[in-house]
């Protein structure tokens, strides 16, 4: 009997320790996770063009112009491409599309589209761009083109979105916001044309995922 009691006491001590130490371990892990999240975020500014950037950053006109021009090049490389002007206008609105030269790897969905495009594709105009410090504390700046639709029927209507369809809120330049550093990473080059409404679907899906992630984070922090 004494041996049995001894075993039970030892088992009780182990279980008690596990139950009471686990919350502490979780708390420590949470602190490290939060610290990691903080380090992975970056403060960026949203501008419509180089003039807006220069006005907000006196003495940085050259940097603003360079970032703007780089964003334009990135937009040409990564923006959604459409085989026809009509498809692009249906997504982004009248006066919001421009012809873009065919890029290596671009492939219309069928021969009719290839003939209609005559070697060129259509893409939305760059509505603005995000600008932030380069990773590693360099003296330069990172930039990311932003697009916006003026078609009320589009999920991208009145919003700033990147080439992947991720939503960054109202299309109002001059704002500053915090984004993950991954938001400033180069996006994949566009290699195929998008069907009419396809980009809007991507925006809608991304918005749903963002809302879900925000809700999960709020519930976790609230316990």
From Swiss-Prot:
Q: Where is this region: Disordered?
A: 178-223
Mark out the compositionally biased spans (Polar residues). Answer: 204-223
Could you tell me where the Low complexity compositional bias lies?
A: 178-195
Give TM segment ranges: none
| NCBIfam families, alphabetized | PRK11653.1
Regarding protein family, the annotation reads: Belongs to the UPF0441 family.
Q: What is the name of this protein?
A: UPF0441 protein YgiB
What organism does this protein naturally occur in?
Escherichia coli O6:K15:H31 (strain 536 / UPEC)
Q: Which gene encodes it?
A: ygiB
């Amino acid at each position: 009997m004494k041996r049995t009691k001894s075993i039970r006491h030892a088992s009780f001590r182990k279980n008690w320790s596990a139950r009471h130490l686990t919350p502490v371990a979780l708390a420590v892990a949470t602190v490290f996770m939060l610290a990691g999240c903080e380090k992975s975020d970056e403060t960026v500014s949203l501008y419509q063009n180089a003039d807006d950037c220069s006005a907000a950053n006196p003495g940085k006109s050259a940097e603003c112009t360079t970032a703007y021009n780089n964003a334009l090049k990135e937009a040409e490389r990564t923006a959604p491409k459409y085989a026809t002007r009509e498809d692009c206008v249906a997504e982004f609105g009248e006066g919001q599309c421009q012809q873009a030269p065919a890029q290596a790897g671009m492939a219309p969905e069928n021969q009719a589209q290839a003939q209609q495009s005559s070697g060129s594709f259509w893409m939305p105009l760059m509505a603005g761009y995000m600008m932030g410090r380069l990773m590693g504390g360099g003296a330069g700046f990172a930039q990311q083109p932003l697009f916006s639709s003026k078609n009320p029927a589009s999920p991208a209507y009145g919003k700033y979105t990147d080439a992947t369809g991720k939503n960054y809120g109202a299309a109002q330049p001059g704002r500053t916001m915090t984004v993950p550093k991954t938001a400033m990473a180069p996006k994949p080059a566009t290699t195929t044309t998008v069907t009419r409404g396809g980009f809007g679907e991507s925006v809608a899906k991304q918005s749903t995922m963002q809302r879900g992630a925000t809700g999960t984070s709020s519930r976790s922090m609230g316990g």
